[in-house]
Amino acid sequence: PHPWTVALTYIKDCLEKETQLHFTTVLFNLYRNEKDSNGWHADNEKELGKDPFIASISLGETRKFQLKHNRLPNIKQDLNLEHGSLFLMKSGSQTHYKHQLPKSTQPKNNRINLTFRNIL
């Protein structure tokens, strides 16, 4: 782990004020182009607790983000996460749903995703 930078501390403080949630860590994901992706998963690691919440901030290229319910896996919800967007995954998100950032068929530039979490 690395210490919080001034910029990340500012973002974290704004998020906590806006959401009334507490975050102890941030994970960076870099998607370099349309070929970079992150397949279907839930952020349900033991250290995040039983029903974790995650705040996701997108920077750079707009990318499609997909959700599907565990009991209805053939029905997908597509969202376009644009530069500066905030997506909150709160109570039930990780226990009832999976999500992914799929590969794109269109050329894409860099996208950075910051996922703020609370490690217990």
Model segments located where?
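Non-heme Fe(II) oxygenase metal-center motifs and adjacent flexible, charged/small-residue loops
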Residues: 1-120
